[in-house]
Design a protein with these regions (language model features):
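Glycine/threonine-rich ATP-lid/beta-loop region of ATP-binding domains
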Residues: 552-559
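Hydrophobic alpha/beta core scaffold segments
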Residues: 567-571
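N-terminal localization/anchoring segments of enzymes in phospholipid and broader phosphate metabolism
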Residues: 1-542, 560, 564, 576-702
C-alpha cells in the first residue's frame, strides 16, 4: 500500500456523520444476511450470496480503486464527512471485508448443508469413489485438458496478463534440477462447463476449476508440484470518462479506447482458495502489483455465479417450494389496454409502480406514439437498457415512420458503455438524432417527452421515472413512473431537451426539479420551509425515500431541521452517511432500510403536512454526484389520488418490520417489531396491484 506523503491536521468529524464506504459495506452485509435468513426460500438465499459477491466485486473495482488512486496523490485527500484519509478508509474497508468474508463462509457452509436433503451436493475430488475418480479423469482428459493453456513463468515466457474476475490455477513447481518455477493456468472458459455433474450421483456436482487443480500433475509431468491454489483478481475500474469529450475521435471510439484501458488497470484485490507460502504470495503480489494487505484467503468458491446452475437443477427437479412464488407484473388498471392510450392519458395522470405493475404499459404508449399521426416527436434520455430492448425498437419504428426522434444515450453509464455504444449506432442508423451525453455532467434523468400537433396547438405527454428504461430490471427493482399530459410539465421537459441539444443544462425551472442547477437548492428551500413552519408553532414534516444519502449540504440541513423540531422519516436502502436518533442533533430523524426480494430503487420526496404536502418522484438520490454533478429530474405529483397512493406506499414502507431494519444511533441496523404479524411492504404492494387489476378486469367484463 503506497503511503501518503504529506500530513495534514486532523479535523474532528461531526458525531452524526458516517463514512460512505463503511456505510455501503453495512448495506452489503444486509444483503448477505438475507443469504443466511431462514425465512427466505433456500434457493433464493443462494441468489443473495451471489449478489453479495457481485456487489463487493464492483465496490472494490470502483470505490477501492478510486481510493487507491487518491493515495498516489502528493497531498493527503480526506473524505468530507468523517475526515478519514484515503489510506484510513482503505484500511477500515479491508478489515470490514475480512469480517464479512468470514461471515460469508459460515453462511455458505450452512447453505450447502441445507441443500443436501434436497439431493444437491457440491463436492471436492477427495470425496469421490475410485470409480468416480476414473470417470472424472476421463472427462478431464477429453473435455477440459485440450482447451487448457499452461504458462510456466520464465524469461522466455513472462508472467501472463490475468483477466479481471477470471479464475486461474497457480502452482509452485520444482524441476528435477531443483529450480522453483511458477505455473499459471486459466480456468475460466466458455468451451467447457464449470458445473460438472457426477454421473453416478444425481444432483452431485464439482466445479471445473477444482478438477483442473486436482489434475495439475498430469499437465506438469516433469515437475513436482509443491503448492497449488486457485486465484482470482479484481481490477481497478476507476477511469476518467470525461476525457472522451477532449478527444478528436468520435465519442464512441474514445469510449471504446477507455474500455480497453480499464481491462488492463492494476488489481485492487487478490483472492486465493488456499494458503501459500510467504515467498510465493510475495512473488504473486509483485508480479500483479497487489499489496499484501489486499490478499484474501477464502474457503468459498471464488466465483459464486455457479449457484444459478444449482438453481436450474432444483427447478428441473420440481423443487419449486425452494423458490419465491412466481410473480407476473400486473397491467395497470388505470389504462384500458384495449383502447388507445394517448386519449386516456390526456384525461388523467398515470403512475406505474414496478415490478408490481408492468412496464409494458409504457412500451405500448411508445409503440402507439410511433404510429400516431398526431405525434411529431419523441425525445428521451437513455442510461441502462435491456438486451433486445423493446424501447429502442419503438424509437427505431418512430424514426422510420417519419417522427423526429431525439435520444440522449449516456455513453458513460458504468459497465454498460459497450451496450450503449451499440444501441447508439442502431438508433443513428434508423434516423434518430443521438446525443452522446453532456460534457462535465452524466445524464442520469429518466425523461421522455412525446410532442403532438393538435387543433389547439402543441400538446405534450411527459414520462418521468425513478428507474431505467429496462424491461429486465423493471421486473426486479422497485421503481415509479409518472405519465402526465400536464402542459407546464411538458414545457419544462421540452426546455430540458432544448438545453441538452445545445450541450447545456437547465438554469431555472418551476415545477420540475432539474439537477445540477435547480434540484439541490430547491430541496434545501423546502427543508427550510419546514423549519419555518415549526418556528411559527406549526408542524413540520419531511419524508424521503432514496437509495443513498451522502450529500453533506443536504445532511447538514436535515440536521438543522431535526434540531428545530421537524419530524423527518427516511427510507434509505443503501449508503446513509447521516446517523439518526442522536440527542441534540438527529433525535427527530428516523431511518429505515429495506432489503428484500426486489431491489429498492424508487425515490420519493415528501415535504409538508397533509394539507400542504408537496410530493415528488425523482431519478436522483441525495448524493453529491446526483445533486450537483449529473442531470437529474424530479417531478411533482399533482393528482390528489396519486399523492394519496404515494403517501400510503411511503407509510407502508416505514412500517415494514420484516425486511425493514432501523438505523440506530450507534450506526448499526436493528430488527424491529411493530406489528402483530410481520409486515412485508413489497408483498403488500404486489397483493394490492393484483387485487386492483382483478377488480378492474371484472368491472370491465361486467
Amino acid at each position: 500500500m503506497k503511503k501518503q506523503q504529506k500530513k495534514t491536521k486532523e479535523i474532528t468529524a461531526p458525531v452524526y456523520m458516517m463514512n460512505r464506504e463503511l456505510s455501503w459495506l453495512k448495506f452489503n452485509e444486509r444483503v448477505l444476511n438475507e443469504a443466511g435468513n431462514p425465512g427466505v426460500p433456500l434457493a433464493e438465499r443462494l441468489t443473495f450470496a451471489a449478489i453479495y459477491q457481485s456487489n463487493l466485486d464492483e465496490f472494490y473495482r470502483v470505490r477501492v480503486g478510486t481510493l487507491m488512486d487518491q493515495m498516489e496523490a502528493s497531498e493527503v485527500i480526506r473524505e468530507n464527512k468523517t475526515n478519514m484519509t484515503s489510506e484510513e478508509q482503505v484500511t477500515a474497508i479491508l478489515q470490514a471485508t475480512r469480517d464479512l468474508e468470514q461471515k460469508k463462509a459460515a453462511i455458505y457452509e450452512q447453505l450447502m448443508g441445507e441443500l443436501e436433503p434436497y439431493g444437491v451436493r457440491l463436492i471436492n475430488f477427495n470425496r469421490l469413489s475410485a470409480e468416480e475418480g476414473k470417470l472424472l479423469e476421463t472427462y478431464f482428459d477429453q473435455e477440459i485438458a485440450p482447451y487448457l493453456s499452461a504458462n510456466i513463468v520464465s524469461k522466455q515466457q513472462p508472467f501472463p496478463f490475468l483477466k479481471n474476475k477470471n479464475i486461474y490455477a497457480v502452482a509452485s513447481l520444482m524441476s528435477k534440477g531443483g529450480k522453483t518455477k511458477t505455473a499459471i493456468i486459466p480456468c475460466s472458459n466458455t468451451v467447457f462447463r464449470r458445473l460438472i455433474d457426477i454421473p453416478t450421483r444425481k444432483g452431485t456436482f464439482m466445479l471445473s476449476e477444482e478438477l483442473i487443480l486436482h489434475f495439475l500433475p498430469k499437465m506438469f509431468k516433469n515437475y513436482e508440484i509443491r503448492e497449488k491454489a486457485l486465484l482470482r483478481i479484481t481490477r481497478n475500474a476507476d477511469i476518467d470518462t470525461e476525457t472522451i469529450y477532449d478527444e478528436d475521435l468520435d465519442y464512441r471510439d474514445a469510449m471504446e479506447k477507455l474500455i480497453k484501458q480499464r481491462r488492463r488497470m492494476n488489481p485492487v484485490r487478490m483472492e486465493l482458495s488456499r494458503d501459500l507460502n510467504k515467498k510465493m504470495i510475495s512473488s504473486l503480489c509483485k508480479e500483479l502489483h497487489v499489496d499484501k494487505e489486499h490478499v484474501f484467503l477464502t474457503r468459498v468458491p471464488l466465483d459464486m455465479s455457479f449457484v444459478f446452475g444449482l438453481q436450474g437443477y432444483l427447478r428441473n427437479t420440481a423443487q419449486d417450494k425452494l423458490f419465491y412464488q412466481r410473480r407476473t407484473p400486473r397491467m395497470t388498471p388505470e389504462l384500458d389496454g384495449k383502447s388507445a392510450l394517448i386519449p386516456q392519458i390526456m384525461k388523467k395522470d398515470v403512475l406505474l409502480s414496478y415490478p408490481f405493475e408492468n412496464i409494458k404499459s409504457f412500451i405500448n404508449l411508445l409503440n402507439e406514439a410511433a404510429k400516431d399521426d398526431s405525434v411529431v416527436s419523441i425525445k428521451m434520455t437513455l442510461y441502462r437498457l435491456a438486451d433486445k430492448s423493446q424501447i429502442v425498437d419503438a424509437l427505431v419504428d418512430a424514426a422510420e415512420n417519419g417522427k423526429e426522434v431525439v435520444v440522449l444515450v449516456e455513453l458513460r453509464a458504468r459497465f454498460d458503455e459497450e451496450s450503449n455504444i451499440e444501441y447508439s449506432r442502431k438508433l443513428e442508423e434508423a434516423g434518430c438524432r443521438v446525443i452522446y451525453g453532456l460534457n462535465g455532467y452524466k445524464v442520469h434523468s429518466k425523461l421522455c417527452l412525446i410532442s403532438r400537433k393538435t387543433d389547439k396547438g402543441v400538446s405534450y405527454i411527459t414520462q418521468i421515472g425513478t428507474g431505467n428504461y429496462n424491461e429486465k430490471t423493471s421486473a426486479l427493482y422497485t421503481d415509479l413512473s409518472l405519465i402526465t399530459a400536464n402542459r407546464e410539465i411538458g414545457k419544462e421537459a421540452a426546455e430540458v431537451f432544448a438545453a441538452l441539444l445545445k450541450g447545456e443544462v437547465v438554469e431555472k425551472s418551476n415545477l420540475l426539479l432539474v439537477a445540477p442547477k435547480c434540484l439541490q437548492n430547491r430541496v434545501l428551500d423546502m427543508i427550510q420551509e419546514e423549519i419555518d413552519q415549526v418556528k411559527q408553532g406549526k408542524e413540520g414534516y419531511i419524508g424521503i425515500k432514496i437509495n443513498s444519502l451522502t450529500d453533506k449540504v443536504i445532511i447538514n440541513k436535515l440536521v438543522e431541521a431535526s434540531q428545530a423540531g421537524v419530524k423527518i422519516e427516511m427510507v434509505v436502502r443503501g449508503i446513509c452517511c447521516l446517523i439518526p436518533e442522536i440527542k441534540g442533533y438527529t433525535e427527530n430523524i428516523k431511518v429505515v432500510s429495506i432489503v428484500g426480494r426486489y431491489l429498492e430503487h424508487s425515490r420519493i420526496y415528501r415535504f409538508g403536512t397533509k394539507e400542504r404536502e408537496k410530493i415528488y418522484i425523482a431519478s436522483a438520490d441525495f448524493m453529491t454526484r446526483n445533486t450537483v454533478r449529473r442531470v437529474e429530474v424530479a417531478a411533482p405529483v399533482l393528482n390528489e389520488k396519486l399523492k394519496e397512493r404515494l403517501d400510503w406506499m411511503f407509510e407502508t414502507m416505514l412500517n415494514d418490520d420484516e425486511k425493514g431494519k432501523r438505523l440506530t444511533e450507534t450506526g448499526n441496523y436493528a430488527d424491529r417489531s411493530l406489528n402483530d404479524v410481520k409486515l412485508n411492504s413489497q408483498e403488500i404492494f404486489y397483493a394490492m396491484a393484483y387485487s386492483n387489476a382483478e377488480k378492474t378486469q371484472k368491472k370491465r367484463e361486467d
